């Protein structure tokens, strides 16, 4: 029997001898992703910082012009033309998460000023 003083040292030596000295990985292994990375065309982007808008990677904080009087966030909103008669009305609508959002079915976020259209 091993004296109590040597027991921790004995366990440590056994562990060092039994454990491999380097990490063993299966042949042909590479990092695995838990889910597919989002793509914009052929480029991968980080959805926590960016989105894909018209096949371009855009920062979440970037804004764009929606008609002359309005701005909108392309990562979160749609710029929709709502034209009737002689006016060009622009409406900013919310993108619905998890759905391919379209102007006719999305809820309105804000309405932009009208501008007369001259022939």
UniProtKB/Swiss-Prot annotation:
<dbReference type="GO" id="GO:0005615">
    <property type="term" value="C:extracellular space"/>
</dbReference>
<comment type="function">
    <text>Potential ligand of the IGFLR1 cell membrane receptor.</text>
</comment>
<keyword id="KW-0964">Secreted</keyword>
<comment type="similarity">
    <text>Belongs to the IGFL family.</text>
</comment>
<protein>
    <recommendedName>
        <fullName>Insulin growth factor-like family member 2</fullName>
    </recommendedName>
</protein>
<dbReference type="InterPro" id="IPR032744">
    <property type="entry name" value="IGFL"/>
</dbReference>
<dbReference type="Pfam" id="PF14653">
    <property type="entry name" value="IGFL"/>
</dbReference>
<feature type="signal peptide">
    <location>
        <begin position="1"/>
        <end position="25"/>
    </location>
</feature>
<keyword id="KW-0732">Signal</keyword>
<dbReference type="GO" id="GO:0005102">
    <property type="term" value="F:signaling receptor binding"/>
</dbReference>
